[in-house]
Curated annotation (Swiss-Prot):
Domain of life: Eukaryota
Keywords assigned: Membrane
Coiled coil: none
Protein name: Sperm surface protein Sp17
Assembly, per entry: Homodimer. May interact with ROPN1.
Gene3D superfamilies referenced in this protein's UniProt entry, alphabetically: 1.20.5.190, cAMP-dependent protein kinase regulatory subunit, dimerization-anchoring domain
Compositional bias per record (Acidic residues), positions renumbered to this chain: 92-108
Stored PANTHER family: NEUROMODULIN, SPERM SURFACE PROTEIN SP17
GO terms for biological process, alphabetical: binding of sperm to zona pellucida
Residues making up the signal peptide according to the UniProt record: none
Length: 146
């Protein structure tokens, strides 16, 4: 969060944004007249749910945000990459090609899809031809009038 015309940035506690998003969503959904009283009741209800179910949406949201912003999946070490490449090369040599057997339904669906694509393309070509004919006729008429 930042303040306009300021270089100050405040650190918001993890999960606080999720709590505010939930409150905002409920305020917009319910449209209460007294927003502070509604917010107090909302947070009390949220606390009761958290105590009963042992599930904290703020903590869960913080974990989701952390996973989103700090994705460690792409941070592999070089030695691991080299070992993985060697393993993949040895595996590809040993693998045998697998043939998939399509059922009749799959073949029928593929044929129907191909027919639809071909029909659409033929229609496109026909429309292009009609446009060319119309433009040629319009050009001939303008030449005859001049």
């Amino acid at each position: 969060m930042s303040i306009p015309f300021s270089n100050t940035h405040y650190r918001i506690p993890q999960g606080f944004g999720n709590l505010l998003e939930g409150l905002t969503r409920e305020i917009l959904r319910e449209q209460p007249d007294n927003i502070p009283a509604f917010a107090a009741a909302y947070f009390e209800n949220l606390l009761e749910k958290r105590e009963k179910t042992n599930f904290d949406p703020a903590e869960w949201g913080a974990k989701v945000d952390d996973r989103f912003y700090n994705n460690h999946a792409f941070q592999e070490h070089e030695s691991e990459k080299c070992e993985a490449e060697e393993k993949s090369q040895s595996v590809t040599e040993e693998e045998t090609p697998v043939l998939t057997i399509d059922s009749e339904d799959d073949k029928d669906k593929e044929e129907m899809a191909a027919l639809k694509i071909q029909a659409a393309f033929r229609g496109h070509l026909a429309r292009e031809d009609v446009k060319k004919i119309r433009t040629n006729k319009a050009e001939e008429e303008t030449e005859e009038n001049n």
